[in-house]
Amino acid sequence: MKKFINVYIKSDYDIVILRLSVIIIFMLFGTYKWFDFEVMALKPLISPTWLNILYIMFGVHGGSYFLGIVETITFLALSIGFFRPAAGILGDIIVIVTGLVTLSLLPQLGKVDSFVIKDVLLLGVGSVLLKYDLKNHLNIKN
């Protein structure tokens, strides 16, 4: 057990698992944005908020597609980040911005639910991945 713990402590397994988790989340939710069930699920959440500007600019479906494109860019950048830290940095920043944008809806929604509160985790995850990718990109050792 001690050997396993030492191997784990010296490895990047935690970051790999964290990155894969976020990739899966953004891949799933980014893909969902192209389907009517998600378009309709987002409508009551987005309509009363400042994000309604997406509906004004692109329509209800177009607003959902826009979010899908952003989430697709995010998971692709995070995936490429395994090999190119600069791409990972882009993905990490979008993860953080996504969390901030979604959390900014709280005052207008007037309630806390799982749609919004999960984004607290995105701030933390994005920050951890950003630090890791910046260190790799700048060749900074611990």
Protein language model regions, located:
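Membrane-interface extramembranous regions
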Residues: 1-73, 77-142
